[in-house]
């Protein structure tokens, strides 16, 4: 009887081990395309994103999560580092489109700071990739509760790019 017990115990442990190994699986999710960052040190990932040509040249790269939108405005598609807070040609903004007080945060000439780096622009596939970080100032100077918002470790990866459509043939 004792031998049968030890024999069954071995098979029991073997079955548990096989079950545990068989139930382990790797669920790999690819986040392509992606637009994400840390917003005031809290993970923020856009559910929708786009990159669109501006009429005067350059591009708007946007990511939205619900009613919140981050927009990066760049003067060109050249792969390089763009410094924020120097002029209004290169800017970053964050807004909540449907909030009651509609807070809006932006960088611009002597306002806010940061950088956007375009690491890749694939004209054939129509995608743009890069990184960003910025601190944007509240456009409402009277809002002392929220003077600024900070985005760090930002990444936009293979965002679909829409070139400017010219209807004049």
Q: Over which residues does each language-model region extend?
A:
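C-terminal or internal capping secondary-structure element at the end of a domain, subdomain, or sheet
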Residues: 121-169
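Surface-exposed helix/loop patches within compact recognition domains
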Residues: 35-39, 43-47, 52-127, 137-139
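Short, Lys/Arg-enriched N-terminal segments with co-localized hydrophobic residues
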Residues: 1-7
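Sec-dependent signal peptide recognition
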Residues: 9-14
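Bacterial signal peptide processing site
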Residues: 25-27
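Acidic, metal-coordinating catalytic segment for phosphate/diphosphate chemistry
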Residues: 32
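C-terminal motif of bacterial Sec signal peptides marking the signal peptidase cleavage site
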Residues: 20-23
């Amino acid at each position: 009887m004792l031998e049968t017990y030890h024999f069954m115990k071995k098979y029991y442990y073997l079955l548990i081990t096989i079950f545990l190994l068989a139930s382990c699986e790797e669920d790999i999710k690819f986040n392509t395309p992606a637009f994400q960052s840390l917003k005031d040190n809290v993970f923020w990932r856009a559910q929708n994103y786009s990159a669109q040509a501006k009429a005067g040249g350059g591009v708007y790269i946007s990511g939205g999560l619900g009613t919140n939108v981050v927009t990066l405005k760049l003067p060109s598609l050249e792969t390089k580092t763009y410094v924020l807070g120097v002029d209004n040609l290169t800017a970053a903004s964050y807004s909540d489109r449907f909030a009651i007080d509609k807070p809006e945060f932006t960088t611009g000439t002597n306002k806010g700071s940061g950088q956007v780096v375009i690491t890749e622009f694939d004209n054939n596939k129509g995608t743009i990739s890069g990184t960003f970080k910025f601190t944007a100032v509240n456009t409402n100077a009277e809002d002392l509760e929220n003077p600024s918002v900070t985005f760090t470790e930002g990444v936009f990866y293979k965002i679909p790019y829409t070139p400017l459509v010219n209807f004049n043939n």
